[in-house]
Amino acid sequence: MNEKLKSNGYTNRKLAKRFDVTHTTVNSYFNTKGKFDFMHFVDALRLYKPNDVEFRRKWIKKMTPHLSHKNLKLALEVLDMFGEYELQDVVMQQIMSLTNEKNEKEKKKGNSKTVRINLNLVPLYKTLRERSENTITPKMFFEKVDKMRKNQKHTDNELVIISVLNTIYSFFDLGNYKMVNEYIQQLLPDILEIKCHTLRDSFLLRIKEMTIFVELHENNLDKARDICFEIINDETNCYVSTKAVAYCKVGESFVFSDYQRAKEYMEKSLDIIGNPVNRKLEIRREKVLNTLLFLRIHHEKDLHTINLEELDEAEKSFLYVKLGENEKAIKILQTLQNENGYLSSFQLYYMGLAVGGEEGKRYLEMSEESFSKSGDFFYISLPKEALKCYN
């Protein structure tokens, strides 16, 4: 691998810069079995065989039994961020296979704390996986995380971090950006204490990604764009999904002001994802496509060419409103209200447009209030603009 990477222009010094380590550390990676930092091993495989995901999966699987306890901990995080959950299962099995007899040996080596932390990380990462693969609703995820948080009082830093990240994502998925921001500020000092810089950087990337959403929804568009470009231009960031999110969010920041720029950035996000290699990236692609379709519907671009099958139910109602088919829109939104027990900020806005008149005005006012309560001062402009017609 080392020789092939060199022939492709990735000398040990260049890899050292990319990995943010010394070139002697990179030399030792290739000279000592099992010496690799797991993140750097995965990145080196991607540089070695960029178009062969099965090759990379095969070698990660082969290396898993040889990983140190610290690398097993890092592997849980890295594979979660890549969305490679079958490989993460292999890592989890390796962690869970530690018997009491082995634990006694590890105590003598001074590894018992890391072994214990790894065992406790497994259920926390399993919960993150449910969210990433869309096998749990935002409400169910929130309730599950809340219950875990109350029942498990963690004190070890890594466990606290993943537990709080689960909590942040639970508020994030419900659109409560005020709580997201509060927990981010609480968590940052803990993350900065992590000694393993690749693990620390991965956690910080998660925080950066969520901060983009917070800044965007607080209508701090320049700040949001700056963070996006930090993620995009970070040479040490090898996560496809975070770069895709960053491009999409730059595009989203232009949703109301510049249709063409918004469209170009969102299409760049789709290019980064390419043909999704796992379920997490499939879902990421669906979300980008949905945002792109929202952009087209909002600006009324080629509405009759939009495939209804590509839209989720709420956006279908938005399209029907723009096409003047208000009754269809109302029917969809009433079904959503019956299923979920409430309408989201966006759905209240769509209902306001569809119903019209004084009743429509009330829905628009509820939408504005809902956006305000959740701390979304970017999309609040939707009901605000619509309400101007009533003045």
Language model features with spans:
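Flexible inter-repeat linkers and adjacent short helices
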Residues: M1-T167, F171-F172, E325-A329, E359-R362, ...
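C-terminal non-catalytic interaction modules
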Residues: N2-G9, A16-K17, T25, L270-P276, ...
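Extended, hydrophobic interaction surfaces within ordered domains
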Residues: T22-R46, V255-L281
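Generic helix N-cap/helix-start motif at coil->alpha-helix transitions
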Residues: D37, H66-L74, V115-P123, T155-N166, ...
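Tandem amphipathic alpha-helical repeat scaffolds
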Residues: K73-F82, N120-T135, I161-N176, F203-E218, ...
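Helix-turn-helix repeat elements of alpha-solenoid scaffolds
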Residues: L79-E101, E130-M148, F172-I191, L216-E230, ...
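Flexible helix-coil transition and linker loops at the boundaries of alpha-helical arrays
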Residues: I95-N118, K147-V160, D190-D201, I232-S241, ...
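A cross-family "folded-core" feature that marks the main globular domain of proteins
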Residues: C228, D234-N237, V245, M266
